[in-house]
């Protein structure tokens, strides 16, 4: 199992959502685990951006996640955070997917509050991290 370390300190408004997203992913996949700490592989930031929230990542644990204030008021914040974290773990967007699919993101609309990856998403992450 690979441990990927994240730094939540630059997103003080989203500490609970970040912790929840990490817990969701940690309970959903076995080949990679997330933990908060120093010398981090990736970091969370917060602020205002007309593009909304996004992940700038290599798709294998490195980079950063930006959490947009306005989008997180409109959409379920734990879902947004878990979705962006999914990018750091290697998953692409799939906006046309249903609410049950985490990587459908904002596609199903603000009424969708599901923060959990589905079976296909979980197995994809496990496969991507099978060899470290």
Swiss-Prot record:
Disulfide bonds join 99-112. Keywords: Calcium, Disulfide bond, Hydrolase, Metal-binding, Metalloprotease, Protease, Secreted, Zinc. Binds 1 Ca(2+) ion per subunit. Binds 1 zinc ion per subunit. Its cofactor is Ca(2+); Zn(2+). It is found in: Secreted. Its EC number is 3.4.24.77. GO terms for biological process: proteolysis. InterPro entries: MetalloPept_cat_dom_sf, Peptidase_M7. The active site is at residue 84. It is an enzyme of class 3 (hydrolase). GO terms for cellular component: extracellular region. Zn(2+) binds at residues 83, 87, 93. It holds the Pfam family Peptidase_M7. Ca(2+) binds at residues 76, 78. It catalyses: Hydrolyzes proteins with a preference for Tyr or Phe in the P1' position. Has no action on amino-acid p-nitroanilides. GO terms for molecular function: metalloendopeptidase activity; zinc ion binding. Belongs to the peptidase M7 family. Specifically hydrolyzes the peptide bond at the imino side of aromatic residues. This is Extracellular small neutral protease. It comes from Streptomyces caespitosus. The gene is snpA.
């Amino acid at each position: 199992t690979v441990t990927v370390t994240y730094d939540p300190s630059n997103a003080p408004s989203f500490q609970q959502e970040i912790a929840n997203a990490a817990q969701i992913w940690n309970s959903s996949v076995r080949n990679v685990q997330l933990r908060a700490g120093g010398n981090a592989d990736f970091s969370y930031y917060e602020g205002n951006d007309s593009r909304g929230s996004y992940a700038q990542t290599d798709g294998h644990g490195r980079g950063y996640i930006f959490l947009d204030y306005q989008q997180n008021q409109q959409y379920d914040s734990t879902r947004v955070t878990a979705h962006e974290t999914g990018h750091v773990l290697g998953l692409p967007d799939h906006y046309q997917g249903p609410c049950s699919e985490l990587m459908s993101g904002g596609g199903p609309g603000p009424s969708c509050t599901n923060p959990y990856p589905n079976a296909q998403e979980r197995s994809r992450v496990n496969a991507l991290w099978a060899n470290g």
